[in-house]
């Protein structure tokens, strides 16, 4: 049987055992990546490693103790539950009832292949037997002879039919062949949100492609002559000015971070997010988020800067995503946070509202939860998540030496651009050689 870690044991018993073998009743405990923060009923507090092989873990597994804490008032029921060795793992078998589909009865091949008897087939007498008398069949009633007028009308109608058959048929217009999937993908890549061209039209592929190529070349020439700004870079500069003007300090932290930072964020090897980390070697990886470096900045700047501390960072992050319409493996994040006074949900929502109104984006804020921070506030545009926001403190803060209240949120810049410019695919807003400002460069 696998040795259960300490947090599992104390959660099951609700008890703690000291080095002297004294049992305490646990009033409250919190578990981080490697630590357990415990508060006893008697008021004693301690921080211990979440170990499988510590003395306390062994004692709890073996159900042995010497005495109880008189201030914790450990009940007899707690003691009995602790001493009773019951199996912690119970297996249940779920039976799913499935109705069998209706199956037609099988028919022998010889019968299935036999021709069906014709209803009007004449009966052939067998040799040596008398022929059966024929059943008299009544002759069909003879149609009355047409009158002279009707006969001439029939003759004229037949003449017209003969003349029409002799005349050559008018040519039938042929429609353009249906577009293949590859052709549709090519045309969709050339389309822009401003185009009013239907791919269901009867125009041939070459004609549609030629028209779209001409439009995209004109778009690139216009950008080169007038704007000369990349959407992503322009948005970064606009966001930087927004937060600097509101008293936030701009941060530029390393992209290559220790792998230990990821583990301290609660992303262990058995989590799904751990599989998405780009690892350089066993010691370093590309940052999947901005939070670890910002945690370190908050702790260090707290020694020098006045209250409250307000910082933000814009930079690339990397994850092995599905790379679909809403995810990228290389993406640009904005994280802003404030630590100290004024760190309330109302102030956080006020900053988010002012920021998105500045960009002209409609949104709504709803409650949610995530693996790293627990309870979060999700900022949504229709069914697209723009941001996850947090009101601290959270248990994870202790791993980074943070013991003050804080608020913060993270936005993906490519998602903001997707909404601002009406892109159907997030790749049009990303760092790419295939698109510039959402315009295909494969011309």
Swiss-Prot record:
Residues 103-177 are annotated as: Disordered. One of its GO terms (cellular component) is cytoplasm. The keyword Cytoplasm applies. It is an enzyme of class 6 (ligase). Its EC number is 6.1.1.26. Residues 131-177 have a biased composition (Low complexity). It catalyses: tRNA(Pyl) + L-pyrrolysine + ATP = L-pyrrolysyl-tRNA(Pyl) + AMP + diphosphate. Keywords: Aminoacyl-tRNA synthetase, ATP-binding, Cytoplasm, Ligase, Nucleotide-binding, Protein biosynthesis. One of its GO terms (biological process) is asparaginyl-tRNA aminoacylation. InterPro entries: aa-tRNA-synth_II, aa-tRNA-synth_II/BPL/LPL, Phenylalanyl-tRNA_Synthase, Pyrrolysyl-tRNA_ligase, Pyrrolysyl-tRNA_ligase_C, Pyrrolysyl-tRNA_ligase_N. It is found in: Cytoplasm. The keyword Glycoprotein does not apply. Pfam families: tRNA-synt_2d. GO terms for molecular function: asparagine-tRNA ligase activity; ATP binding; pyrrolysyl-tRNA synthetase activity; tRNA binding. Catalyzes the attachment of pyrrolysine to tRNA(Pyl). Pyrrolysine is a lysine derivative encoded by the termination codon UAG. NCBIfam families: PRK09537.1 (NF007083), PylS_Cterm (TIGR02367), PylS_Nterm (TIGR03912). Belongs to the class-II aminoacyl-tRNA synthetase family. This is Pyrrolysine--tRNA ligase. It comes from Methanosarcina acetivorans (strain ATCC 35395 / DSM 2834 / JCM 12185 / C2A). The gene is pylS.
